[in-house]
UniProtKB/Swiss-Prot annotation:
GO terms for cellular component: chromatin; nucleus. Residues 16-25 have a biased composition (Low complexity). GO terms for biological process: chromosome segregation; gene conversion at mating-type locus; mitotic pre-replicative complex assembly; replication fork arrest at rDNA repeats; site-specific DNA replication termination. Homodimer. Residues 221-236 are annotated as: 4 X 4 AA tandem repeats of G-[ATV]-N-M. Sequence repeats lie at residues 221-224, 225-228, 229-232, 233-236. This is Switch-activating protein 1. Residues 1-30 are annotated as: Disordered. It is found in: Nucleus. Residues 1-10 have a biased composition (Basic and acidic residues). The N-terminus may contain the DNA-binding domain. Last 40 residues of the C-terminus are required for chromosome segregation. The keyword Glycoprotein does not apply.
Length: 254
C-alpha cells in the first residue's frame, strides 16, 4: 500500500530549509543509504502517534528537523522527508509482493521491513479513523436530511387533513341541502295538487253558472207586479233545486 493514498488531503510542500544558516552543513540528498533509511524509519515509528489527521505536514517537518539535527541525515525539509518515506514504503510494498518463502534477507533489511510494518499499521489506523469519521459525518448529514423531509411530510399531512376536514364539512352541508331540496319539491307537489283541485272546483262552479237559464224566469217588462216577482222567486228556488239534481250525474264527464 502506498503512503500517499492514506492521506486525506494533500498539503502544500514546505521546501524551506530547517537550518538557520543559508548554507546547511550537510547537503540534502535524494538518495539515502540502507543505514540512513533505517534511522529515518526509526524516527518515524518512534513518533508515529504524533501523526494525526490533517497534521501530516507538521509531522514530516518535525521528523526532518530531528533527523537532520540529531541523526545527521541529509534531509532538512518537510517535502524531502515526506518523499523519502514514500519512496521507502513503495520499495517495501514491492518487496512484499515479490517475497518468496525461504528468501534470504539481511538483518538490516529485516529491521527495515519491521519498521515499515509498524508504519503501515499506523497509516491503516488513521485510514480507519478517517473512514469512520466520514461515515459518521455522512450519517449526520443523512439524519439532518431525513429530519427535514419528515418535517415537510408532517406539514403536508397537516394540510391534507385540513382539506379532508373541509371536504367532509361541505359534503355534510350538501347532503343537508339535498334533503331540504327534496322537502321543498314535495311541498311544491302538494301545492300543485291543491292548485289543480281548486282549479277543478272553479271549473265546476263556472259550468254550473253556465247551465242555469235565467231568461225563462226573468221579468218581461218594467210594470210587472209584485205577485209575479214573489212567485218567480219561489219558482226559481224550486227550479234550481231540480237543476242541481239533474246536472250532478253529468259532472263526472267533465
Amino acid at each position: 500500500m502506498e503512503a500517499p493514498k492514506m492521506e486525506l488531503k494533500s498539503y502544500k510542500r514546505k521546501n524551506a530549509s530547517l537550518s538557520p544558516s543559508s548554507s546547511p552543513a550537510k547537503a540534502q540528498r535524494t538518495h539515502l543509504s540502507l543505514e540512513e533509511k533505517i534511522k529515518l524509519m526509526r524516527l518515524v515509528v518512534r513518533h508515529k502517534h504524533e501523526l494525526v489527521d490533517r497534521k501530516t505536514s507538521e509531522f514530516y517537518a518535525k521528523i526532518a528537523r530531528i533527523g537532520y539535527e540529531d541523526e545527521g541525515l541529509a534531509i532538512h525539509t518537510e517535502s524531502a522527508c515526506r518523499n523519502q518515506i514514500i519512496s521507502i514504503m513503495r520499495v517495501y510494498e514491492q518487496r512484499l509482493a515479490h517475497r518468496q518463502p525461504g528468501m534470504k534477507t539481511t538483518p538490516e533489511e529485516d529491521e527495515l521491513d519491521q519498521l515499515c510494518d509498524e508504519w503501515k499499521a499506523r497509516l491503516s489506523e488513521l485510514q480507519q479513523y478517517r473512514e469512520k469519521f466520514l461515515v459518521g459525518k455522512r450519517k449526520c448529514d443523512c439524519n439532518d436530511e431525513i429530519n427535514e423531509r419528515l418535517k415537510k411530510l408532517t406539514e403536508e399531512q397537516q394540510n391534507v387533513d385540513m382539506l379532508v376536514a373541509k371536504v367532509n364539512f361541505l359534503s355534510k352541508h350538501l347532503h343537508d341541502n339535498e334533503e331540504k331540496l327534496m322537502q321543498v319539491n314535495a311541498k311544491m307537489d302538494e301545492v300543485l295538487a291543491e292548485n289543480k283541485r281548486l282549479q277543478q272546483l272553479l271549473d265546476h262552479n263556472d259550468l254550473l253558472s253556465k247551465l242555469e237559464p235565467p231568461s225563462a224566469y226573468a221579468p218581461h217588462g218594467v210594470n210587472m207586479g209584485t205577485n209575479m216577482g214573489a212567485n218567480m222567486g219561489a219558482n226559481m228556488n224550486a227550479i234550481r233545486g231540480g237543476l242541481h239534481s239533474s246536472i250532478s250525474p253529468n259532472l263526472g264527464d267533465h
